[in-house]
Amino acid sequence: MRTILILNPKGGCGKSTIATNIAGYFAMRGKNVSLADCDQQCSSNDWLAIRPEHLARINHVPLKKGRLHVPIDTEILILDTPASIHDKKMVKILRVAQTMIIPVLPSAIDIRAAERFLKDLIKLRRKTVNNKIKIATIANRVNEMTIAADKIEDYLDNIKLPNGRKIPYMALLRATQNYVHAAEQGKTIFELAPSRTYYDREQWKPLLRWLNSKRSLP
Ligand SMILES: Nc1ncnc2c1ncn2[C@@H]1O[C@H](COP(=O)(O)OP(=O)(O)OP(=O)(O)O)[C@@H](O)[C@H]1O
Ligand SMILES: [Mg+2]
């Protein structure tokens, strides 16, 4: 089973949005996908609950007594995580994932929070057995052609690990109500009218290529 983790302790950066869209994308490609919501807000579970039956099926992963009960035939597990996650829980989650995506919003506050989080993450990564987890960043909810858009691109494009390797910056997702409308209907943007979401689908391509390649695996 492959596990993809969406993590950034900063609230509202788009973790659940990215998690549900990735889950739907792989389910549409015929994979047996489970979506686990480690978040008490249960945004991903709420989304799953209203997902129309005729769309590609995604398994719900019940959280019982702090443990996730993942269906055994799962091929791809998507882990949506809460804001303000504490270190102990983060280490636990980091141990089981092969791939991690960090969404960041284009604001000075979010960039500073991401800097702090990445520092902590690098420390934790050394401590965890899973030092090989592949990480990528994405900029989310970006209003293009703004100074904030330039700043977030510049920041994400230049993040390096202590060994000098770059953390790949994989996508810029624009701010659009398409994500809001899709979420309201238990859908992904890949399940809305292509004419309306063409631009968004294009923006997802580099991230999806990365997820489909060995580069995103240890
Ligand atoms: N690219 C986008 N364009 C417009 N709205 C977006 C975009 N991405 C996310 N949103 C909206 O922003 C809000 C926050 O997104 P989301 O719930 O995915 O964030 P989160 O990181 O999971 O939040 P939390 O930390 O509270 O779990 C939601 O209303 C979502 O629909
Ligand atoms: Mg969430």
Residue ranges of each PLM-predicted region?
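Walker A (P-loop) phosphate-binding motif
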Residues: 1-28
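Short beta-strand-centered segment that lines the nucleotide-binding/catalytic pocket of NTP-utilizing
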Residues: 29-44
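NTP-binding/hydrolysis catalytic cores, primarily Walker-type P-loop NTPases
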Residues: 188-218
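Conserved C-terminal guanine-recognition region of P-loop GTPase G domains, centered on the G4
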Residues: 112-132, 140
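Switch II (G3) loop of P-loop NTPases
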Residues: 71-90
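Inter-motif core of Ras-like GTPase G domains
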Residues: 88-108
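P-loop NTPase switch/communication element
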Residues: 41-56
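Beta-strand-loop-alpha "switch" segments that mediate conformational coupling across diverse proteins
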Residues: 143, 153-190
